[in-house]
């Protein structure tokens, strides 16, 4: 795509060297649009799917009035939020009040720059893709803290403190789990990590994916991922029964929609990261001898992401909310020790004769 745009502007339109630069910029913008528009539409219908799934689990119907089978409900929700007035507390910090939602949303968008959907569908294929993801997603907590403090509300500030402490705590456990994947893959490049899952003793099958040999750390990662996204049962940052709605209690209209969008984009990002790191990415679960069914493709990547997102919804509908002290105890006294212990165990395993990743 980049070469096509550069040829278009440099040769066809006669812009010369300037055309090469313009073509590069235009190709990047087009790639960003190709990622962002499906991503926003996915968020819209993820909310619809969530309400339908939870309604089914609770023996309800869910959205079924706006459009056929309620399919236009996400757009109705968007228009409702867009046309609502954005109000703010009189004593709040105006600049920081509006910067908070933007700082929460921007990292969740920027992280998609390095997420591949197959060997070719990636905006930027860098060797430190995993490190980039961990770095960029950790910035979103600043938006939460700023929003909670700038609102000048005790409920907002308490929710922001809870969210930031929880996010920082579970980032440690999640990072420990991802370190284990890097150890067995020998790379932080997502394409290399996926390729490594097709090798080893059980290479070419679903049993060679990282979820099986790293199963204990896979469970640690899944729990940490739910806590990182502040989803039920770890949604104490916005515990309605305790602190009304957490750090975005004072937000309305489009400003609230930005927080909402950031949360769901982060959910989809975690689903993509889970697929790449533990579930073989775009690798097929079937042997390649099965023809097109066994061929690696972006379809399998999307299917695995959908399965992880369904797991998110199932967890929300099944488990009650934990108390804040229980969440912090689980993170610091259970998941983090298990994560660090497994790093040591995995190191010994890899230098032993029982190494599965040779």
From Swiss-Prot:
Q: Name one Pfam family in it.
A: NADHdh
GO molecular function terms attached to this record: oxidoreductase activity, acting on NAD(P)H, quinone or similar compound as acceptor; quinone binding
Keywords recorded for this protein, A-Z: Cell inner membrane, Cell membrane, Membrane, NAD, Quinone, Translocase, Transmembrane, Transmembrane helix, Ubiquinone
Membrane topology, as annotated, equals: Multi-pass membrane protein
Q: What is its EC number?
A: 7.1.1.-
List the GO cellular component terms: plasma membrane; respiratory chain complex I
Localization in the cell? Cell inner membrane
Predominant localisation class: membrane
Q: Which reaction does it catalyse?
A: a quinone + NADH + 5 H(+)(in) = a quinol + NAD(+) + 4 H(+)(out)
Domain of life, per UniProt, equals Bacteria
The membrane-spanning stretches of this chain are: 20-40, 95-115, 128-148, 168-188, 206-226, 253-273, 295-315, 334-354
Q: Which family does it belong to?
A: Belongs to the complex I subunit 1 family.
What PANTHER family is this protein classified in? NADH DEHYDROGENASE SUBUNIT 1, NADH-UBIQUINONE OXIDOREDUCTASE CHAIN 1
The entry describes its oligomerization and partners as:
NDH-1 is composed of 14 different subunits. Subunits NuoA, H, J, K, L, M, N constitute the membrane sector of the complex.
Record's function text: NDH-1 shuttles electrons from NADH, via FMN and iron-sulfur (Fe-S) centers, to quinones in the respiratory chain. The immediate electron acceptor for the enzyme in this species is believed to be ubiquinone. Couples the redox reaction to proton translocation (for every two electrons transferred, four hydrogen ions are translocated across the cytoplasmic membrane), and thus conserves the redox energy in a proton gradient. This subunit may bind ubiquinone.
The name this protein goes by in its record? NADH-quinone oxidoreductase subunit H
Task: Give the encoding gene's name.
Answer: nuoH
């Amino acid at each position: 795509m980049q070469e096509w745009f550069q040829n278009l502007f440099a040769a066809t339109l006669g812009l010369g060297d300037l055309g090469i630069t313009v073509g590069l910029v235009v190709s990047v913008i087009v790639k960003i649009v190709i990622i962002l528009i499906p991503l926003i539409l996915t968020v819209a219908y993820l909310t619809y799917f969530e309400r339908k799934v939870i309604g089914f689990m609770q023996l309800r119907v869910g959205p079924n009035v706006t459009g056929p089978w309620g399919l236009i409900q996400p757009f109705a929700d968007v228009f409702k939020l867009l046309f609502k007035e954005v109000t703010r507390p009189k004593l709040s910090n105006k600049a920081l009040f509006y910067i908070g939602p933007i700082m929460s949303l921007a990292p969740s968008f920027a992280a998609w720059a390095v997420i591949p959907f197959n060997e070719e569908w990636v905006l930027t294929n860098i060797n430190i893709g995993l490190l980039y993801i961990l770095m960029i997603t950790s910035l979103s907590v600043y938006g939460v803290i700023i929003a909670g403090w700038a609102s000048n509300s005790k409920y907002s500030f308490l929710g922001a403190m809870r969210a930031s402490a929880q996010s920082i705590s579970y980032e440690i456990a999640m990072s420990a789990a991802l370190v284990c994947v890097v150890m067995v893959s020998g790379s932080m490049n997502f394409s290399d990590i996926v390729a490594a899952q097709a090798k080893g003793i059980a290479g070419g099958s679903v049993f060679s994916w990282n979820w099986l040999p790293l199963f204990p750390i896979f469970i640690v990662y899944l729990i940490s991922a739910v806590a990182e996204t502040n989803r039920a049962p770890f949604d104490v940052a916005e515990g309605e029964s305790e602190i009304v709605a957490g750090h975005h209690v004072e937000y309305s209209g489009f400003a609230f929609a930005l927080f909402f969008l950031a949360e769901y984009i982060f959910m989809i990002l975690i689903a993509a990261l889970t697929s790449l790191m533990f579930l073989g990415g775009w690798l097929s679960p079937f042997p390649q001898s099965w023809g097109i069914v066994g061929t690696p493709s972006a379809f399998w990547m999307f299917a695995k992401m959908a399965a992880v997102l369904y797991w998110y919804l199932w967890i929300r509908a099944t488990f009650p909310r934990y108390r804040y002290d229980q969440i912090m105890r689980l993170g610091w006294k259970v998941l983090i020790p298990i994560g660090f212990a497994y790093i040591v165990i995995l190191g010994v395993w890899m230098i032993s004769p029982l190494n599965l990743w040779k």
